[in-house]
């Protein structure tokens, strides 16, 4: 059983659409399963004026009845309130008057290559879809997948590890789900209070200097059975699917599983997670350097992945570029922008990890109704004698 998510819509168009196909029938869905994470995506110190306009809420137009999935594709609409200010410029239909084109691509953005690839003279035909506004739809779809995972005993969280030059200290112990209870109370979604304050100062300082900031976020998932994914074919390896999902988030340029870059510099005896067994605990590991993935499969430990985000490519003090109509030197486009979206990227990362994990459960366990899935998972857990 395949699960997939597809989105449509432009940043300043009428709205965004998300379709999730492949969830079983009978799964209970509440409005807050979608809307809560969309609100969280709008949080974070360093966001721009757009967040004062948009108040994202999901309107389900298909696939649900009376709060339960039907087994058919689920369609979600999210209105762009800012469309009222762009109605003529972003109308789906021919405009009555000539609309001024944008000819100034931003270094680091999809602008230039997109106009070359799709034979466009107007950069706006590229930048509108390339915008991270699209992630609002992904987060809505991810909310459906999170609801499915919760029914299976799986929870997904995120936090920020680094913004610009400020990095939070590594946790002294493995994190537990309850450790994430207060993460959204931090203005940068960082678990360390001292680092959180330093990150806010860094954002303010660089914003005054007309700069944007990148950073690193981490996503963790708890309650995963061993054996999601596979070693038998490259495209079935779960770490590869997760890498694609995280790196598909706008401005994300790097990915890591567990202690990947740290263990690259260690001897093998200090890089792997030794395996133990007791009658009380069953099979277990004392460490989780692998980040919950071995051989392309979940190993029963918490899944830990990280995404590295570059500074945003829209700057209030633009970089040098060219005018694609004249090929003359010019400053890049000035567009309303955020200074830092690393906290929001963590929420998007949760959604993308949830989509990948939900798809992995569907591939392994199938089932037309949620009860079928639960029975299949329970039978598998009994066969491998796995203990949560």
Regions found by a protein language model. Give the residues of each.
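Generic N-terminal targeting/processing segments that precede catalytic cores or assembly contacts
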Residues: 1-388
């Amino acid at each position: 059983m395949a699960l997939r998510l597809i989105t449509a819509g432009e940043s300043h168009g009428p709205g965004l659409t998300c379709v999730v196909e492949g969830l079983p029938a009978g799964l209970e869905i509440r409005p807050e399963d979608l809307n809560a994470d969309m609100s969280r995506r709008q949080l974070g110190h360093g966001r721009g004026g757009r967040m004062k306009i948009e108040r994202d809420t999901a309107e389900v137009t298909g696939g649900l009845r009376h709060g339960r999935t039907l087994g058919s594709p689920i369609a979600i609409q999210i209105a762009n309130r800012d469309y009222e200010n762009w109605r003529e410029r972003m109308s789906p239909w021919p405009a009555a008057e000539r609309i001024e084109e944008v000819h100034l691509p931003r270094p680091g953005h999809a602008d230039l290559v997109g106009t070359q690839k799709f034979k466009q003279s107007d950069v706006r035909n590229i930048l509108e879809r390339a915008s991270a506004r699209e992630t609002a739809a992904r987060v809505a779809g991810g909310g459906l997948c999170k609801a499915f995972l919760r029914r299976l005993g799986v929870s997904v969280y995120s936090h920020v590890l680094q913004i610009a030059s400020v990095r939070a200290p590594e946790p002294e112990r493995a994190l537990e789900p309850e450790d994430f209870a207060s993460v959204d109370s931090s203005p940068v979604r960082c678990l360390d209070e001292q680092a959180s304050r330093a990150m806010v100062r860094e954002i303010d300082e660089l914003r005054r200097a007309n700069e944007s900031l990148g950073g690193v976020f981490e996503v963790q998932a708890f309650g995963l059975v061993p054996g999601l994914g596979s070693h038998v074919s490259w495209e079935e390896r779960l770490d590869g699917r997760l890498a694609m999902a995280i790196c598909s988030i706008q401005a994300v340029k790097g990915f890591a599983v567990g202690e990947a870059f740290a263990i690259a510099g260690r001897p093998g005896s200090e890089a792997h997670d030794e395996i133990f067994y007791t009658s009380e605990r069953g099979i277990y590991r004392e460490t989780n350097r692998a980040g919950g993935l071995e051989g392309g499969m979940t190993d029963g430990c918490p899944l830990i992945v990280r995404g590295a985000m570059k500074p945003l490519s829209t700057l209030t003090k633009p970089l040098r570029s060219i005018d694609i109509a004249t090929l003359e030197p010019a400053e890049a486009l000035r567009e309303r922008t955020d200074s830092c979206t690393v906290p929001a990227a963590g929420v998007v990362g949760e959604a993308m990890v949830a989509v990948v994990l939900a798809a992995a459960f569907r591939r392994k366990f199938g089932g037309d109704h949620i009860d079928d899935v639960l029975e299949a998972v329970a039978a598998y857990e009994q066969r491998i004698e796995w203990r949560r």
